[in-house]
Amino acid sequence: DLTLVVGRTGTGKSTLLGTLNGIVPHFSGGRLDGTVTVAGRDTRTHRPRELADVVGVVGQNPVAGFVTDTVEDEIAYGMEQLGISPSVMRKRVEETLDLMGIADLRRRALLSLSGGQQQRVAIAAVLAAQPRILVLDEPTSALDPTAAQDVLASITTLVHDVGLTVILAEHRLERVMHAADALWWLPGDGSVVQGRPEEVLARADVVPPLAALSRVMGWPTVPLSVREARRRVGPRPGLPRAPQPSEAMTWHGGGDEVLRVETLGVNYGQVCAVDALTTTVERGTITCLMGRNGSGKSSLMWAIQGATKSSGRVLVNHEGSWADPRKADAATARRMVSLVPQSASDLLYLPTVAEECAQADKESEVPAGTTRAILSRLRVELPEDRNPRDMSEGQRLALVLAVQLSSRPDVVLLDEPTRG
């Protein structure tokens, strides 16, 4: 079966998944009430290493689970720990590389991969060990839409054809809810509502498009696919047609250029990530950067921010004059361009939320409480004494966004800002 776990950020989805292989409470601390039994083994008395042959887990941050240097070695590592013979390992490595569409990455260094590529490698490393239960915490959060569909299709095939049990937490429900056999909803009060997806989604506080349509139409259950929704609606000759978009789109720019990029290039050895890009961005506008995993989106953002070595020029209209943030001092550069990276936790290093907020206020030279106020405007309430490492990926992302916005930068760069 494929079980889907849903709930808002911070409701305990990752904690619940952590109980399935003993990470909670053996490594997380806390008190576990009740029992979790996996293949006849009680997770309270069996540590994660004693469950590794039956439960495979891919967390929200794949890099945190890597232990080797290259893709091929990482996929083989888990099988080595389980004592699988070399001949079987070689066969499984090849099969998994093909299944996940990463055969061309086999000899690449893990740290040289994009976030989406790393996510696919992490899933491949777990699948190669052929666990009986696969636990995935937001497995498509860093994947482009095509890659996400490919990965979910592969997982669904394993469920239906091989009998693999998959428990999956996901925010983008429209991608996977049609394939789910059961759904667990975490309202945030510590309880878990279980049932059939179409029944639970009808009352859950997470509302994918089809659930929103269901509520408007007054349907008792939620259609799990567009095809099913169309069947329910049936012919409605009295309904007005949706307005058709005009051929000519009107550009609503701010009129004031804030960013100029001139022949910007980024190269890693013989690999060209960004090739002589020239563009401008106007103040008060939102620019969407799209591309497949590994196409250079993050490289471009880091180059604009100044952390990645690049050629060409980057100019920001800061306080009435044009300057290159790559050549400015740290404080000025932060007020010119701020970047929220894919791995938001990389920017968090203090032991509490309060200290992170206070440090951001100090570095941004703004009144005390500014960062905390921004966090509240993001509708994320975090206890001041909470350690960022104990928070969910989404909560850490919100905290980093508040920290970066505290300096009121001219340009804000967001790399996969909806993870978690």
Predicted segments, located by residue:
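Conserved ABC ATPase "signature" region
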Residues: 87-105, 366-384, 394, 400-402
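ABC ATPase C-loop
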Residues: 126-127, 405
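Hydrophobic anchor residue at the start of the ABC signature
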Residues: 121-123, 151, 401
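Catalytic Walker B motif of ABC-type/P-loop ATPase nucleotide-binding domains
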Residues: 134-137, 143, 412-415
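Conserved ABC ATPase signature
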Residues: 109-113, 117, 387-391, 395
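ABC ATPase NBD Q-loop/coupling interface
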Residues: 24, 35-50, 313-332
